[in-house]
Amino acid sequence: MLVLTRKVGESLLIGDDIEITVLSVRGNQVKLGVNAPKNIVVHREEIYHQIKALADNIPESV
């Protein structure tokens, strides 16, 4: 795992198309902005796991 330190207003670039910017920090909460192409799906981890669990419970059609 790559670990980085960023300040408010600083960004992290992933590839050529994805930019993650630190918007604010309050206590133990960090607000991030994600700028990515519309074809890139972005979810919070807990939402991703909910979607995956729902998809795993859907029976495959024959």
Curated annotation (Swiss-Prot):
Subcellular location: Cytoplasm
Keyword list, A-Z: Activator, Cytoplasm, Repressor, RNA-binding, Translation regulation
Pfam families: CsrA
GO cellular component: cytosol
GO annotation (BP), single: regulation of carbohydrate metabolic process
RNA-binding found in the keyword field: yes
InterPro entries per UniProt: CsrA (IPR003751), CsrA_sf (IPR036107)
Matching Gene3D superfamilies: Translational regulator CsrA (2.60.40.4380)
Family annotation (SUPFAM superfamilies): CsrA-like
A single MF term (Gene Ontology): mRNA 5'-UTR binding
Self-association and partners: Homodimer; the beta-strands of each monomer intercalate to form a hydrophobic core, while the alpha-helices form wings that extend away from the core.
Family: Belongs to the CsrA/RsmA family.
Function of the protein: A key translational regulator that binds mRNA to regulate translation initiation and/or mRNA stability. Mediates global changes in gene expression, shifting from rapid growth to stress survival by linking envelope stress, the stringent response and the catabolite repression systems. Usually binds in the 5'-UTR; binding at or near the Shine-Dalgarno sequence prevents ribosome-binding, repressing translation, binding elsewhere in the 5'-UTR can activate translation and/or stabilize the mRNA. Its function is antagonized by small RNA(s).
Name of the featured protein: Translational regulator CsrA
Lineage: Bacteria, Pseudomonadati, Pseudomonadota, Gammaproteobacteria, Pasteurellales
